[in-house]
Regions:
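A structural signal for short, hydrophobic/glycine-enriched beta-strand patches
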Residues: 5-170
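C-terminal capping/extension of enzyme domains
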Residues: 156-191
Length: 191
């Protein structure tokens, strides 16, 4: 039985990804210096609010995030701040939908919560590979992340190519300070 190779070995020159040397180096540095995937931790009851970050535009993972919230949060009297792609799957729940007609960044979503509750403790709900950035962003703006709940899936048919697989996500995240997700998807032919 063969083991899965480390992520950085998935980006070798002969792969389907057409990456120049600088891009491969950037990816290797990102993989070596970043927490790629998080697991759930902490006690929800220690937070003053729950903030749920969507993952992609499709229903696939966002519906799973909504179901996770429904199963994990029932019984707690804690305000729910849900990004619109998750909120649409929870019409019966009492929540605050974080809506916007244009693309919302992780920081945009966290900023709405901060504006509403101030510097308080929160539980983050996110996709496992997106979770570290959600935690870092919340902490950077003054929200104290005391708990995390995750879904570990990728939406294979999402309109955003960078969320369709672990490899696509890592390529995008390793270049996020220089290109948008759409630019990275086009440049490296993410599918």
């Amino acid at each position: 039985m063969s083991e899965t190779p480390p992520y950085h070995e998935s980006f070798e020159h002969k792969s389907r990804y057409q990456l120049e040397d600088l891009a491969r180096k950037r990816i290797q540095n990102y993989v070596a210096s970043t927490v790629l995937k998080r697991r759930s931790f902490g006690k929800i009851q220690e937070s003053k609010a729950i903030v749920a970050f969507s993952f992609g535009d499709s229903a696939e993972v966002n519906k799973d995030l909504a179901e996770l919230i429904s199963s994990e949060v029932s019984g707690f009297d804690i305000p729910l701040y849900l990004q619109q792609e998750i909120a649409s799957h929870m019409p019966e729940s009492e929540h605050i939908a974080i809506e916007n007609q244009s693309y919302q960044t992780t920081k945009d979503v966290a900023a709405v919560v901060l504006k509403n509750i101030g510097e308080q403790s929160v539980t983050v709900v996110a996709q496992a590979f997106h979770a570290q950035r959600c935690i870092d962003t919340c902490n950077e703006i003054g929200l104290d992340v005391v708990a995390l709940r995750v879904v570990n899936r990728f939406p294979s048919n999402d309109p955003q190519p960078w969320v369709r697989s672990e490899v696509n996500w890592i390529i995008k995240e390793s270049h996020r300070d220089t290109y948008t997700g759409y630019e990275i998807s086009d440049k490296y032919k993410l599918s």
